[in-house]
Amino acid sequence: MAGRGGRVLLALCAALVAGGWLLTAEAQEPGAPAAGMRRRRRLQQEDGISFEYHRYPELREALVSVWLQCTAISRIYTVGRSFEGRELLVIELSDNPGVHEPGEPEFKYIGNMHGNEAVGRELLIFLAQYLCNEYQKGNETIVNLIHSTRIHIMPSLNPDGFEKAASQPGELKDWFVGRSNAQGIDLNRNFPDLDRIVYVNEKEGGPNNHLLKNLKKIVDQNSKLAPETKAVIHWIMDIPFVLSANLHGGDLVANYPYDETRSGTAHEYSSCPDDAIFQSLARAYSSFNPVMSDPNRPPCRKNDDDSSFVDGTTNGGAWYSVPGGMQDFNYLSSNCFEITVELSCEKFPPEETLKSYWEDNKNSLISYLEQIHRGVKGFVRDLQGNPIANATISVDGIDHDVTSAKDGDYWRLLAPGNYKLTASAPGYLAITKKVAVPFSPAVGVDFELESFSERKEEEKEELMEWWKMMSETLNF
């Protein structure tokens, strides 16, 4: 993954150096703006942010520009390719890019899953530019975030669909053309339907998390999954993400799990075990967006049913049922909590409105990112201080566990309250601790687990000591 991303980066950088900022011929696609148009874009920036639509070559150029400006805290990599061969590019921002630092949580933003929903794509490009600019200015909030969080930003999960939508004239950009990938697959209905599995497990007993454990090969062999879907599944499996948001368009609301209803009906509040923290996470986004959180905002369209919306948030199933969505897949296949944010009534609004969308969402994007530092965090180790990977962290009263990463580090998002946490692992004695969780920051709770073999040896030594004492006392 990283090697291929490195080769792409070297090629892009060579082209940038040779041509000032132009891309290679490989990046010039049919329908892409001419060089003169790209130069116009370079001139139309405000505080380092270009409030214009970025076609695929320009998206690559924008990410490379951020990397060239902030090489010490960023890197570009790809998680795979779209059906038509475009790279699914990610820019990472961290004080140690490319490395998972033990104890540091991992965050991701994904945009443009539906190719014709363009605002999220642009906001994530703007966000990368903003984080780089503000870090260099010494903005304390941004510096602290980048030093304490590994941030991954994927502006476009569906670059093929976006190119198709962007090539349409006028209003045809908006509602239909380019929504699906180049195969005609709706990516947000294409993930393994883990909701149906967990709903059965709720009734009959069974796992409540990591429902795709050790099934990567099956994912690769599933011909019904789009290449974009497979790439993201591997990404989710490979990196210990804690928090995520998937940016869409077509309405104004922050949507939280579950997306698919339990009964199969079209509309039904479908709470997940972490309903309390998910409501709080959704509000952390919506409350900083003045339009999204406005209780008097009229529906985007006359016949829209926004009755499930509360403070700019909604439970997914209460709004409308979505089987096979990426949001619930994150929650049920990994440790990652994800919400879906609808950013705009129009899916592909006029270019001149992009600046106002950025102004409405900038604080929300930062606020949501900060939520990763809530709940409980820590390490699970053995008595010798060695990390225990894949240890289970259970919360009494919440039927959804998380697991420790390879360094024994774990993160458990929780709403404020008093909890009992239990750490367990095969071959070890479980330990339970009580913890009072504030709104923020995350409380550190470490666990040291004793192995069964160590306990047996300890019991043997205690027995020998007892026998020695009895022998000395009774003189035999």
Swiss-Prot record:
Cellular localization per UniProt: Cytoplasmic vesicle, Secretory vesicle; Cytoplasmic vesicle, Secretory vesicle membrane; Secreted
Family matches, as SUPFAM superfamilies: Carboxypeptidase regulatory domain-like, Zn-dependent exopeptidases
InterPro entries in the cross-refs: CarboxyPept-like_regulatory (IPR008969), M14_CPE_CPD (IPR034232), Peptidase_M14 (IPR000834), Peptidase_M14_domain (IPR050753)
Pfam family, one: Peptidase_M14
Entry-listed glycosylation sites: N139, N390
Domain Peptidase M14 residues, every copy: 52-372
GO function terms (MF aspect): carboxypeptidase activity; cell adhesion molecule binding; metallocarboxypeptidase activity; neurexin family protein binding; peptidase activity; zinc ion binding
Catalytic reactions of this protein: Release of C-terminal arginine or lysine residues from polypeptides
Domain of life: Eukaryota
Family under the similarity heading: Belongs to the peptidase M14 family.
Protein name: Carboxypeptidase E
Phylogenetic placement of the source organism: Eukaryota, Metazoa, Chordata, Craniata, Vertebrata
Gene, per the UniProt record: Cpe
